[in-house]
Amino acid sequence: MQNHAKQKILYLESLRGVAALIVAIFHFDIGSIFNNELTKNGWLMVDFFFVLSGFVISFNYLDKIKSFSDIVQFQIKRFFRLYPLHIIMLFIFLVIECSKYLVKLKFGLSSTIPAFTYNNLNTFITNILLLHNLVDNRLTWNVQSWSISSEFFTYFLFGLIILFSARKKLIINILSIVIVLLSFYFLQNHSMEPKYGFIRCLYSFFLGVLIFNFSNSFKFKITNYLSYIFFILSILLVIIAEPEKIIGINIFLPLIFSAFILSLIMSQNKNYLIYLLERKFLIYL
């Protein structure tokens, strides 16, 4: 079972790589053949990441967190995985803000948004502490780092739930369902914008926790055609998704992503999607 599960992780890593590529193209906003509806809505792949993270983190740590010191060690590992690049990018943006200020001071040239208007001392401190997506009312500095802030504290909440539930799956599942439902309700009445990123992360991450527990509890196999259907449905819904400020179908995407991942995990042998995703060039991606 363990070896089989580890084999499954390989194609999930490939999915992570493909999603990362789509997100990167979305942020670079490059033209040509890459400028299409799939990449224009590539921001939704972040939610795919969150679902995957919920599954993978549960797979690796659900049975390992037995004390508060285990949570601390878990958070330290997450910290050193997320923080180094975040702090490097933060100081790069600090250099940019200082350059804008000096150019204004010396040459009288000002940018559309003057230096340190939003990227100021207060938001710099919240970014240093990874609190920015939880407490700031807008995105600042390296705006894409909102997901890092959200993930870090979602991981911490996950650790607390595992610890205080004594790893009892029924309690974990009930709490996960409550978090998913409350997050869904909140987002439905607001939006999927990054300023609500923490709630968005909770929603998708704990869906990932739920599909891990489901796949780990029920060993039956389902037809491969379900994974093909959910794969096509995921792509189609991303293509026709609404802008971030409009809820529309966007709020249902994490549910479809979860169904797709679960259908892969519980699929029968000779699944062509798994065969493709286990090719080395995709794993290395």
Located regions from the model:
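Helical transmembrane-bundle signal
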Residues: 20-23, 50-56, 90-93, 123, ...
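Juxtamembrane transmembrane-helix termini
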Residues: 46-80, 85-110, 209-213, 265-268
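Alpha-helical transmembrane segments and their helix-entry boundary regions
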Residues: 9-12, 73-74, 82, 147, ...
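Alpha-helical transmembrane segments in multi-pass integral membrane proteins
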Residues: 1-12, 18-42, 58-72, 135-136, ...
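Residues within membrane-spanning alpha-helices of integral membrane proteins
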Residues: 13, 17-20, 53, 84-90, ...
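Divalent metal-coordination and catalytic microenvironments
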Residues: 16, 24, 47, 54, ...
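Membrane-interface helix-loop-helix regions
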Residues: 83-150, 184, 255-261, 265-266
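Generic alpha-helical transmembrane segments of integral inner-membrane proteins
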Residues: 21, 87, 91-95, 99, ...
